Each structure stands twice: as structure tokens, then as C-alpha cells.
Amino acid sequence: MKKLSILLAIIMIIGIFAGCSNTNNANADEIRIGVNYELSGDNATYGNSAVEGIELAVEQINAAGGINGKKIKLIKYDNKSEPAEATTLTTRLMTQDKVVAVLGPATSGAFKATIPVAIQNKIPVASGSATADDVTVDSSGVKEYAFRICYSDSYQGTAMANFALNNLSAKKAVIIMDSSSDYGKGLAENFTKTFEDGGGTIVAQEAYVAKDTDFNAILTKIKGEEFDVIFIPGYYNEAGLIIKQARAQGIDVPILGADGFDSPVLLELAGAEALNNVYFSNHYSSLDENPVVVKFIEDFKAKYNKEPDAFNALGYDLARFVADAISRAENLNGESVKKALEETTDFEGVTGSFSIDEN
């Protein structure tokens, strides 16, 4: 009889632990959401801006009563702009901190590195700014636990090529690309296709890698070509220096980029004068008169005493997007939240209205 009692107790304990692992924080007074962003390192501008937006959104949600009466608790870590660290932190957030979803990272490479962990643990990861085309679907199929709320590199690469052709009447372009990132390679590929399909010619394509600082050899080389624009698919750290050094060499043609240019560090590195005739695509405009945008700007300025940038807006939208799904989820676990995310339609955010499709 004693053996039977011990056996029953063991079975009950196993059942309790199994229930905890499946429901995460279903019985807690709070809802845990992971925050895995680039708070230091090369891409810290993106991460810190996104987290400011996330924290504003969560502050507002909690002040309004939380999600179905439960407050959100953010579990925040710095992935140091390193994909390997982002992966490690995702594992920690899901297996130790017991979150129901993870927000971030900001960059495509780091975000993609976390997706296998999400799939293994059946807990969704969501990014506001991972723009690489293969973030949510690739040749192997749909990545079911990965979500994003931003446009893709094919979209913005195409948009910038059309801008060069139609708005700047460019016929010849040079590409100086970050060959060390999926982001840079994807943008270059899509810009090239659209520009050439529109009758333009890529007269030169040069490459650099992240952390390069001296681009004078590349710029001296392209000065021997005739071109109307330069497209730089890369991040602000290198782009700012390329722009500064190009202007110093007397290259005054329009310089184009994508959302990776969106950082005050670009201005610090390049200087205000060098940024004349520089254009880049972005997710958000502070001039938008949409009431949702106007209210966000007012609230953001009240909290942080500064104007919001696009990554602030994307972080804000991302937190609200995931919170909305959690409010509709059948249970507080990763699988239920993932299903609710998939069912999102016509979500109106600061950066636009969006719905989740099968890809």
C-alpha cells in the first residue's frame, strides 16, 4: 500500500510539471513576454529604439488593465548584436523564463537564428524589422512560429529602384553592398532586378563587410565609371562613412539606401552637408496625419521628450500586435498564441494596417 501511495504521488508530481510546461504562465497574475534585442554592439540604435516603443506600448496596455485582467511583464535581454547570443537568449527566455512569445531581434540575421529555437519549443518569435525575404518562408516551407509586421527587402529594394528610375531619371547605377548580411544581399538583388527590368544598367557592384571603415579604394575605383546614382544596401555604421568619404572624393550623385539608414548615427558619421541628396526607404513618417500616428507621436514625446523614429514606431506596433493576439488566444501558451497571431486581420498600427497571410 505504501508503494502504491508513493507511485501515485510521483504520477501526480509528473502531471503537475507537465501541466506547467505546457501552459507557461496560464495561472500567474502576469503574462511574460520576452524581449531579445540589440541593445549594444553594431546595431544598438535599432534595438534601443524598438525597445522604447515596446515599453511605451506595454505601459499603456497595463495602465488600461492589461490583457484580460493580467499585466504584461517584459523579460528583457541584450543580444549584443550577435546572432549566436540572440539564439542563446531565445532558449533562455523560452525554457527558463517561460515566456509565451519573444519580441525581436531587430535585424534579419539575428532574428532568423532564433527561429529554430521557436519551432522546437513551439513558442512564437516576432520582429518589427526583420525584412529579409526568407524570414518567414524559404525553400523548405513556411516557418510556422516566425512572424513579422514589416515589409520585405524585395518590396523596399524594388521601391528604391523605381524611385531611381522614375523620380531621379537614373539610367546607370553603382551598388556598394554589405556582403556580410542577408539584408544587404537581398536588397542588392531586388534593386538590380527592378532597375534592369526598367531599362537601367548596373555599371559596377562593389562589396564590403560589416565593421569596415575605409572605403576610399572602392570609391576611387568607381569614379572611373559613369553613373547617376549609388545604392548602398547596408546599415548606418558603414553607410555613414561611405557617404562621408564619397562626398570628400567629389562624388555628388544621389545616394540611395533602405531602412538600415534610419539612425541618428548616420548623421553623426556622415555630417549634415554630406547627407544632401541622400534618400532611403522607411516604414513610417512623422508627417502622417492618421490619428493613430498623431496620438503615438504625442504619447512618445510625453514619455521620452524626443521625436520618435521608425524603429520606435515598429517596436510599439509589434508589442501591440502580439498583445492583441494574446488577448484572443484560447490559452496562455505558445501554440495558442501562434494560432491567434495567424488569425490577425486588419490590425491598425502606427506603421500601417496589416494582416497575417499564410507566408
Segments and roles (model prediction):
Residues A44-E55, T158, G184-T192, N290, ...:
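Short, surface-exposed alpha-helical segments at coil->helix boundaries
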Residues T23-A28, Y46-E52, A64-V137, Y208-F215, ...:
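Beta-alpha junction/loop-to-helix N-cap segments that form part of ligand/metal-binding clefts
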Residues G34-G53, Y77-A84, A106-T107, I176-K185, ...:
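Extracytoplasmic "Venus flytrap"
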Residues I243-Y316:
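Extracellular/periplasmic periplasmic-binding protein-like sensory domains
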Residues K98-A204, P254-N277:
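Extracytoplasmic ligand/sensor domains, especially the bilobed periplasmic-binding protein
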Residues A302-N312, A323-N359:
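Segments of small-molecule ligand-sensing domains
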Residues M1-R32, A63:
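Short, low-complexity disordered leader/linker segments with a strong preference
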